[in-house]
A protein has these predicted regions:
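Eukaryotic N-terminal, low-complexity and coiled-coil-prone scaffolding/targeting segments
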Residues: 1-13
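Alpha-solenoid helical repeat scaffolds
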Residues: 14-35, 44-545
Length: 545
């Protein structure tokens, strides 16, 4: 361990200090354990002695071991301790900064970023701003004010300008952000990160043609930068002009022959243009690229599935790993189930959970969705209870179990799981909406249900499923006019059989039977086997449409 520690040869040399016998024994035991490969024991001893002695040399060695072990919690504690003992230590400042960022304390982190800026490293100012996007509005505004105050004494520092522009963008102050990005271009015209930021802001502020032209030029000038290529592909696709995207990507792919990000974009453009053979040819080449092969196999699987070649689709989905593992596995499991091989699908998912423990919660969720789709509700509930034994408190698994319980009519279990989610995350819009909808559907606690749904809607004001829930609870309360307004809005945002079932029912109840039939008829054309619409028709005795 001591020879291989990544920081072992770069740290500051500290003079040997006399230690009490107990400390010396603990440190010697730690070094011996490290040589035997018992890194956890070595780290525990060094962290404990770093706390006890506060000695910078002990802290530095503890940091080396924590880095070797990849123990972020220990690194965070040691970084803060190091800064307390040696305020001018750059490595300690870096560790403290990223610890505070992980803890969601960006203004405290900015103190250390300022120190690093004064010592020649402004990069953390960019990273800090990039991680501020999810902050509450008041804390985000305070951080932006801090950046602006710092900029007064560093008016042309590119890292500070970049971070400030990001914060302004996040705050919706697009013109101010654009002005700073233009200043960055003047100071560093050939820096890819500046070009990317500036063109994205041009696009956001409506100068879409100018943004696309400048980003295309940047891609030509920096063929080695995949980030620019990926951004160019996204910007092209946002235009929703597939023919134009193909033309541009074919041109650039001929110039930047080694840029596989462009080729991947071209493959997707071919797919969207209903040119599967061209898409397949590109993707088969990209399947040889270590960075893109997983995504390539996933999309090859989709092409094969669309062509009805189930065997080939399954082969490709099996090869999709990394970030593509879960979506590919979900498709593969569905294909097996459609062939009547549900048991084989479940065995495959069980094997993957052993091989990819870090992905096990998602794999449990895929299996539960499969069981619910096949109407094995009790099995799904049992599986999710098992999964929560291995991953207690997992929000996605709790939510999935609530769905299974709802299918079984176990509303008490639904409420328990959704409230367990809200105990962890009171602003979880999905849980708020699901609980409100469940109460509206299966109880008379309508006011409580509406309050929960309105909280969800405040968090996601344009979510059609939440708007549908609000319409439904208003209907259950007898507020038919208000319910119709919300359900019509939901239907305009989302084509969905549940929304159609609800809208049709309210129309039917208010006497507009012809409009209700038209809504149901249109929905059944797209979803001919939807059980909710059929159950609604039967319950209302709506007769043949």
């Amino acid at each position: 361990m001591s020879q291989e520690s990544p920081a072992g040869d770069e740290g500051q040399d500290y003079p040997v200090q006399p230690f009490p016998t107990q400390t010396l024994y603990a440190l010697l035991a730690a070094e011996t354990a490290g040589l035997r490969g018992d890194v956890p024991f070595a780290l525990r001893n060094y962290v404990e002695q770093a706390r006890i002695t506060g000695d910078p040399g002990v802290i530095a060695r503890a940091v080396q071991i924590a880095q070797h072990a990849g123990d972020e919690a220990a690194l965070g504690e040691l970084g803060l301790l190091w800064v307390d003992r040696e305020p001018d230590n750059v490595q300690g400042r870096e560790l403290a900064l990223f610890t505070l960022l992980r803890q969601g304390k960006p203004r405290d982190a900015l103190v250390h970023a300022h120190f690093l800026l004064e010592n020649g490293d402004g990069q953390p100012l960019r990273q800090l701003a990039a991680q501020a996007a999810g902050l509450p509005a008041d804390r985000h505004a305070a951080l932006l004010t801090d950046y602006q105050a710092l900029a007064a004494s560093h008016p042309d520092d590119v890292d500070l300008l970049f971070g400030q522009a990001l914060l302004l963008w996040q705050a919706g102050q697009l013109q101010e952000a654009l002005a700073l990005s233009a200043q960055l271009i003047e100071l560093q015209p050939d820096e890819p990160a500046n070009q990317l930021l500036h063109t994205q802001l041009l696009d956001e502020t409506g100068s879409k043609e100018k943004a696309l032209a400048q980003l295309e030029q940047a891609v030509r000038e920096h063929p080695e930068n995949p980030g620019l290529s990926r951004a160019f592909v996204r910007m092209l696709f946002s235009r929703r002009d597939t023919a134009f995207a193909i033309e541009k990507l074919e041109q650039l792919s001929r110039i930047n022959r080694g840029d596989n990000s462009l080729r991947f974009g071209l493959a997707l453009a071919y797919r969207d243009a209903s040119l599967p053979e061209q898409a397949r040819a590109e993707l088969e080449l990209l399947a040889r690229d270590p960075e893109l092969r997983n995504d390539a196999h996933f999309h090859l699987g989709q092409l094969a599935e669309a062509a009805g070649d189930t065997k080939r689709a399954i082969q490709h989905y099996r090869h999709a790993q990394g970030a593509a593992l879960l979506p590919a596995t979900a498709r593969l499991a569905n294909l097996l189930a459609q062939q009547g091989e549900l048991t084989a699908a479940r065995l495959y998912l069980q094997e993957l959970r052993v091989q990819h423990r870090e992905q096990a919660p998602g794999l449990f969720q895929i299996e539960s969705e499969l069981l619910i789709r096949e109407r094995y509700y009790s099995s799904a509930q049992e599986l999710l209870t098992e999964s929560l034994g291995a991953f207690p408190g997992d929000i996605n698994l709790l939510y999935a179990r609530s769905l299974a319980s709802e299918k079984m009519g176990d509303i008490d279990a639904v409420e328990r799981d959704l409230r367990a989610i809200l105990d962890q995350d009171g602003d979880n819009a999905a849980a708020l909406n699901a609980l409100g909808y469940s109460l509206a559907n299966h109880s008379t606690r309508y006011e409580e249900a509406q309050s929960l749904i309105e909280r969800a809607l405040a968090l996601q004001p344009n979510d059609a499923s939440i708007i549908d829930s609000l319409g439904w609870v208003l209907y259950r309360r007898g507020l038919h006019t208000e319910a119709l307004a919300q359900l019509r809005r939901a239907a305009a945002l989302l084509t969905d059989p549940e929304v159609a079932a609800h809208l049709g029912e309210v129309l039917w109840t208010t006497g507009d039977s012809e409009q209700a039939r038209a809504v149901w008829r249109e929905a059944l054309q797209q979803y001919p086997d939807d059980p909710l619409i059929k159950a609604t028709l039967e319950r209302l005795n709506a007769g043949p449409l």
